[in-house]
Amino acid sequence: NVLEPFSVTSKSGTLNFSSGDNIIIADGQAKTLRGLDGDDTYFISNLLPKNSTIEVIDTSGSNTIQIATNTKVVKTLWTKDATRLTFEDDKVITINGADNFTFNMGGNVTDGTDGVDLTFAEFALSFGIDDVLNLSGSDTGIITDMYII
C-alpha cells in the first residue's frame, strides 16, 4: 500500500495544535506544523503534496515522528539538533529540535501498526551519520534512496 497526496499544493501559514496528545498528519495543510504541550505524533508519508516544504516545531512533551511504510527518503541533512528529510517528488520536511523526538519507522498510528522506535542518534545512523549529537556543523547522509519498511 502506497499512500498518495490528495492535494496538489501545500498551504502557507502555521497550524498550531492543542495542548493535548495530538495525532498530526502532514498532508500539506500548513507550511509549519507546531505542536504545543502534550505528547504528539507527526505522521509523515506520501500524503504530502509534490514539491512541498514543511517544518515541524514542537518543544514540549514526548513527541514522535512516524514515517509510514513505503515512504522513500531520497536524501537527508543533519545537524546536532535538527534534520531535513527529502522524500520522492521533492517533498521536504525540516524537524527542529529533532534530538528530542522519537523516530518511529514503518508504524501507522491510523491503523495501529507499531513500527520500530529509534532515538535521533539511531535514526541518523541508519542514514550513515555517526555521532550526530556531536556534529559541529551540518552533514549529508551517505545512505540515500531508502524506503522505510
Where are the predicted features?
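Low-complexity acidic/polar repeat-biased segments
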Residues: 1-7, 82-149
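Acidic, glycine-rich calcium-binding repeat modules characteristic of RTX/beta-roll
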Residues: 12-16, 21-81, 91-102
